[in-house]
Amino acid sequence: MSKSRSLVRLLQLASPMLPVGAYSYSQGLEWGIESGEVHDLESAQAWIGDVLQVYQGGFELPVLSRCYRAWQRGDVEALNEWNAFYLAGRDNAEALAESRQMGYSLKRLLLEFEELSGAWATMLEALPNASFPALYAGISQAWEIEEQDALQAYAWSWLENQASAAMKAVPLGQVAGQKILLGVAGKIPVLVEAAIQMQDHEISNFCPALTIAGCRHETQYSRLFRS
């Protein structure tokens, strides 16, 4: 696949139009708003930036990198191990349900793409209970999207969804949403490079405030976002 075509595929994968339901989750941010921790542009940017740095950079992006390499090698065993590792690291019911639902939705979509066949389809069949990052890595590799580009697109999509959630729930205006993107996006290239270079034993999902926020959101009385 040509580089220009891979870029188009990358944009498709990173698009908010990707029908996996990411827009319906706030990943604990809505509880941060309910608690008063997030209440304006500055606090929203701080919350989102911290989660990107600690959780995305320390856990999701490194796992995504491992899944990408497993697809690249055709290593079904490693792919299943990292998929299970990721699901085990989703340490509250809401986060686990989110990843399973998004993974299920992405898998259904991918099965409609006739160009994805052969060894790729065989590995997909051998991946029961697939998480969203495991499938995202697979489609990135199948579409010949470079590992670094795939990770940056994944992080950008997450950031864009978080900014959108803040705009809806704080609420914030569109200019404020763009300021969040400008203020936080600069971290992405550094975090992606660190994720690729990270040793397996350094990967950690330790982000207790995010975990607590997810647990509290499960029973939040009034909410816009899915639990």
From Swiss-Prot:
Where in or outside the cell it occurs: the entry states:
Cytoplasm
* Main subcellular localisation: cytoplasm
What GO terms are given for molecular function?
A: nickel cation binding
GO cellular-component terms in the record? cytoplasm
InterPro entries found in the cross-reference section: UreF (IPR002639), UreF_sf (IPR038277)
Which controlled-vocabulary keywords does the entry list? Chaperone, Cytoplasm, Nickel insertion
Q: Which domain of life is it from?
A: Bacteria
Query: Keyword Cytoplasm, does the record have it?
Result: yes
> Pfam family of this protein, just one?
UreF
Q: Does the keyword Cytoplasm apply?
A: yes
Instruction: State the protein's purpose.
Output: Required for maturation of urease via the functional incorporation of the urease nickel metallocenter.
The family annotation for this protein states:
Belongs to the UreF family.
Q: How does it assemble?
A: UreD, UreF and UreG form a complex that acts as a GTP-hydrolysis-dependent molecular chaperone, activating the urease apoprotein by helping to assemble the nickel containing metallocenter of UreC. The UreE protein probably delivers the nickel.
Q: In its UniProt entry, what is this protein called? A: Urease accessory protein UreF
Q: Which gene encodes it?
A: ureF
